[in-house]
């Protein structure tokens, strides 16, 4: 599977190497060195429009959130077919008005992750040729020929081979005419820089999330907490993996340059975003209201947990009151559990009612579709069996009958409103 990912990476690196070595006249080692930066420029330039679209879609989704909340509040408690259809229509109109594209945020990751995997796999195969570095048998890797693989293997930066890594066995380092100390002295600042840049990028991403976080969504709140944890752990990965894992020098260079590009691109795009699409007053008011509600719930939860823990501590300090304190904790837990279950049950009932209404709408739509298909077949059969003396329909009528305007939304998207012909 990873072999497929090698081809685009090796193809881009080969083109940059040919351009820098054959056209610009750079030394072979320098050409391979700068081809890594060329790979970053190429990939980031390709995904830059999608990244901007992701930023823009995120800001648009924030602007539309107060209007969606108002619609949900307006149709709260309405489960009949007419209300659901009207709500769906108004939501679709709102999405069209603001140009919402929920898939825009997926593209950068879908492009960048395979590139990183392909680069890592390609460099690892270069650093570990068949037969070992002592008796290498060079083979084609993606679009790279055996001669180009051998040339890359001989590439050096500050006298450190591009395929070398800190945890590489001593025999292989000796074959590459280097030592672990030389490799460590070169890559350690790179991995530290990569860790710092990663931390800054995560902090900026968290800042954007705090700006527009949907506090009414449990998933959004969970993702925000996950990002907080990852912002602490993410900077550790470059150091730990770089110093203990098989991460060649070339990947360290790619890592630093890619994170630096990400930082500069994020700063530029955030400045443009704030100037062209500033947060609206409606969103700010709605965001503050939702945040206050969320914080009140969190405070209530903390008070509950703190009271229960305090009672447990008092049970140890004052054992003569243990039974009373335990009964208090049991009662507190029962009350809170009952409140949570009641709220869950209410949400579940609402969801079930809407789901049942939606099923009825889907069944009715499918029935109408079958009926229309049967009518069209009957009309076509009547035309074929018609007598030659009978008036035949015009050419336009035949075309219309042979290509009936069946509602496409009924099969693919049965949730939408049926056409006026029904």
From Swiss-Prot:
The chain crosses the membrane at residues 30-50, 103-123, 183-203, 226-246, 253-273. CDD domains: 5TM_YidC_Alb3 (cd20070). Residues 401-413 have a biased composition (Polar residues). InterPro entries: YidC/ALB3/OXA1/COX18, YidC/Oxa/ALB_C, YidC_ALB_C. It is a multi-pass membrane protein. It is found in: Cell membrane. GO terms for cellular component: plasma membrane. One of its GO terms (biological process) is protein insertion into membrane. Residues 350-422 are annotated as: Disordered. Residues 350-362 have a biased composition (Basic and acidic residues). The keyword Membrane applies. The keyword Translocase does not apply. Keywords: Cell membrane, Chaperone, Membrane, Protein transport, Transmembrane, Transmembrane helix, Transport. GO terms for molecular function: membrane insertase activity. It comes from the Bacteria. Pfam families: 60KD_IMP. Interacts with the Sec translocase complex via SecD. Specifically interacts with transmembrane segments of nascent integral membrane proteins during membrane integration. Belongs to the OXA1/ALB3/YidC family. Type 1 subfamily. Required for the insertion and/or proper folding and/or complex formation of integral membrane proteins into the membrane. Involved in integration of membrane proteins that insert both dependently and independently of the Sec translocase complex, as well as at least some lipoproteins. Aids folding of multispanning membrane proteins. This is Membrane protein insertase YidC.
